[in-house]
Amino acid sequence: MGFKLKGFGFLTLFASQAFLTACSATLTVANTNHKNESDKFVIFEPQPPLSQTIPKPEAEPVIEPDAVATPPVQNAEVQIKPDSSKGVYSPGFKFNTNFIPKVNTKYRPGYDLSFALKFGTSWKEAYGTGWLIDWKDVKQDNKFTAYLATNLHVADSLRNKDDYKPYNKDGNQKEFLPGDITTEFSLGKYIDAQTVQKLTPEYQNLKHLNNRNSDALVSIQTSKLPKTAYTATDFIKTAQYKYNHIVSNTVYELDLFQNAVSYADFAVLELELNLANNRDQQIFDSFINPAVTAYEKLGNSLGLFSNLQLDQYVDDTHYLLGYPLLKREKTSYWNLPQKGYSSPLYENSNKEVSRITRNIRKDDEIPGSRLVQNQINYLPFAQNDPKGVMDFSKYLNYVFNYHEKQYQHHGYGLLLEDTDFPGGSSGSPLFNQNKQINSIYFAALPSKSYGVSQILRATQNKDKSKNYDLIFGDSNTKKYYAQFAKEHKTHLYHQILQSNDEQFRFVENDQTVTSQTPFKS
């Protein structure tokens, strides 16, 4: 995500020199020169006094071409348009940006499903990446409900008083602080010039806006704030993490989760679009509907997610695409607010935007990432872990505060060679060479240029006591997304009903109350 997160022991893995940096980003509105670059799961958010009034001009699209009018092209018939699928490389940044992948290529699934997320309060913006995981099939009058997967630490930026319980209050069930309440939400995507023109017809006669003829990052404000559909908090049965520890012939019980509730860095947001609203209709037509089509072609809900033995991930190539917050440079950018909406004036918006990025590097241009195979040299307690896999439950100070409630990281992650994406990329889906999602990107280990992702389904782990499935559930997972999907009759649940495969049908026999609180009572 893209802001500096609050004071975590998240950064240090015991005595090792490994520092995990959460890939999110935050900008303060009042002090735009103080941007938290890539956050280190140490959130530092300088809050201005709430009494300060930030100028809020009447809403107009923030249009940021590279900014001078261009003279007419003389021999236009011989102009050859650059191949937008190749992208560009910027000085000082090794990854490929500003591209639209060709159909049927390895990065196309990530492009089709993924979006730039922006959360705004009265004094700051937070950025992350999200992707379409589900939607409601049932036709609703002038409504469409989409579900976007992202990281838990990205979803932490949503403080919506009208959210589902218990997410409408903090983790101690207290009201959110006024300055933390989310006031606006935008969905963005890097799109081709033709779609840019379709979304900005009212500006077609403004000749100086030459970026209407360019591929661009377009961010559109929604008419309503999202709600929280699912958080991977208190998601695992932890009884098996109690051990007898013998010291001087005395037996002590060691409970790894004695002082904190488990979490995985995964969440799902519900976004209801009002199709009678022009901006929401634009989001549906240009962002969500194409994603639905791509999702179905990728194998739909039951074919989209991989489910491997932990020692098999090392054989795969992993493709990452997300929207880190980077210097704008030659990136055309449109910010389309709701009609009549007064939004803060972001002075820094001409310097940094969410730029589409993939793990192709300037020095070799070999697509994708392989897993680290010698993590024992950098991480303690990794002796028995499969190559490239990290067992988060071994690192007791790897904790996170979601809505002011502390949780301890659990589950398994992938350690990716040379994949240290900056803030704003948190929440990006990681695809394998078979175009299946295996995990969700959430952090970087900058000292080694490693990226880290959270495995979503670990049901075939040979250590059966540590199985989990954040999507479809299993006997060791007490809180998973399919519970919400069943309760709300979503597309993913309808897909489950059509399957006879037991790996997807656990929710049908699960008697767990789906509206359970994620907070320990």
Swiss-Prot record:
Cell compartment(s), UniProt: Cell membrane
Lipid attachment points (S-diacylglycerol cysteine): 23
Residues spanning the signal sequence: 1-22
Lipidation residue positions, type N-palmitoyl cysteine: 23
Bilayer topology term: Lipid-anchor
Disulphide-bonded residues: none
Listed InterPro entries: Mycoplasma_peptidase_DUF31, Peptidase_S1_PA, Uncharacterised_MG067
Keywords assigned: Cell membrane, Lipoprotein, Membrane, Palmitate, Signal
GO cellular component entries: plasma membrane
Domain of life of the native organism: Bacteria
Pfam families the record matches: Mycop_pep_DUF31
Similarity comment: Belongs to the MG067/MG068/MG395 family.
Name by which UniProt lists this protein: Uncharacterized lipoprotein MPN_592
Taxonomic path: Bacteria, Bacillati, Mycoplasmatota, Mycoplasmoidales, Mycoplasmoidaceae
